[in-house]
Regions:
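Short flexible/disordered coil segments
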Residues: 1, 31, 66-70
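Amphipathic, hydrophobic secondary-structure cores in small proteins
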Residues: 2-5, 9-22, 26-50, 54
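C-terminal structural segments of small proteins and small subunits
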Residues: 49-82
Length: 82
């Protein structure tokens, strides 16, 4: 199943978004952003399954948690989302 990576600047932001998602019934995980996806050094990503991606985006926005970039991971490839 395709997954989305919501890239954030700190582990604290990632954990806050993770908590909000879990409270909303969305299963997510926090990981170091895969190497090569960003040029900003160390960052973290909140990984969410495709059906829950729009709600996770909304939760980040509603709670003023800045998402730097978003990527779709499918068939072994990362595709940046607008």
């Amino acid at each position: 199943m395709p997954k989305y990576y919501l890239v954030v600047s700190s582990v604290t932001t990632a954990q806050r978004l993770q908590k909000l998602c879990r409270e909303a019934g969305i299963s997510v995980s926090v990981v170091h952003t895969p190497q090569g996806l960003t040029d900003r050094g160390c960052s973290y990503s909140v990984v969410v399954k495709e059906p829950d991606f729009p709600r996770a985006q909304s939760l980040a926005s509603e709670n003023q948690l800045p998402v730097r970039q978003q990527f779709l991971y499918q068939d072994g490839e990362y595709i940046e989302c607008p």
